[in-house]
Regions:
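Charged catalytic cores and adjacent phosphate/nucleic-acid-binding surfaces used
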Residues: 1-10, 21-64, 102-103, 116, ...
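Alpha-helix-centered segments that form part of catalytic cores
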Residues: 85-121
Length: 215
């Protein structure tokens, strides 16, 4: 995945597996090899079946948050024959174990609790693919809640999104890549050579503006 990101001309990417950050260490190591900055993160499923992205400044915070999220998953084991293997990778493409719980399940945390958990580890919560029918905030809840505020949201490419949901918000454009061929080419360009810290600072600053930035 990281190598393909380099081929696509991407300088900074986020790795956000479902309900775990356990593969972030290997992704960051691969990023050093390929010259790609990797932001450690997760895509957490709330009990309402809403996907919330969590971006973290450091690997340790992401891993600790990931352990707490994993504890909130139901004790339902993955069935590889049905859902595929949930591999932990090390040293490139070398499998180093598996995770037992089925990661695509919802946690027992509400949307608000997921956001609070991410923030408690210094992370940035961002609603994922809000305009996608499944697991997007609009499709799952029927609306974009007024509170907590979501100044930054992610939208899914090629799917219409209501204007009220995006007005005044900073939009991240998602490839939501689960396969190599899904990885998009760059959407945003920063004036200076970007780093992961630059991207996180931009998102955090936009989040801090809150409702002041909205019409």
């Amino acid at each position: 995945m990281v190598g393909m990101a380099r081929v696509k001309g991407l300088d900074v990417i986020a790795i956000t597996d479902h309900n775990t950050a356990r593969n972030a260490p290997d992704a960051i190591a691969a990023g050093r090899e390929y010259g790609v900055q990797v932001i450690p993160g997760m895509e957490i499923t709330s009990r309402e079946e809403v996907h919330i992205l969590g971006y973290f400044d450091g690997l340790d915070a992401a891993l600790r948050a990931g352990e707490e999220v994993y504890a909130h998953l139901p004790d339902i084991r993955n069935e590889p024959a049905l859902f595929g293997n949930q591999l932990l990778m090390r040293d490139g493409d070398t499998p180093a174990g598996t995770l037992e719980k089925l990661l695509i399940n919802a946690t027992d945390l509400s949307v608000e609790e997921v956001c609070a958990l991410i923030k408690s580890y210094g992370g940035i919560p961002v609603p994922a693919h809000i305009n996608r029918g499944s697991n997007g905030m609009i499709g799952a809840l029927g609306l974009m809640p007024m509170l907590p505020e979501y100044p930054v949201v992610e939208v899914y490419k090629g799917v219409p999104c209501p204007k009220y949901a995006t007005a005044g918000r900073f939009l991240l454009h998602s490839s939501d890549a689960h396969r190599l061929e899904d990885i998009q080419e760059r959407v945003f360009e920063l004036d200076a050579l970007p780093t992961a810290a630059d991207v996180l600072r931009l998102i955090r600053e936009r989040n801090a503006l809150g409702s002041e930035a909205r019409p």
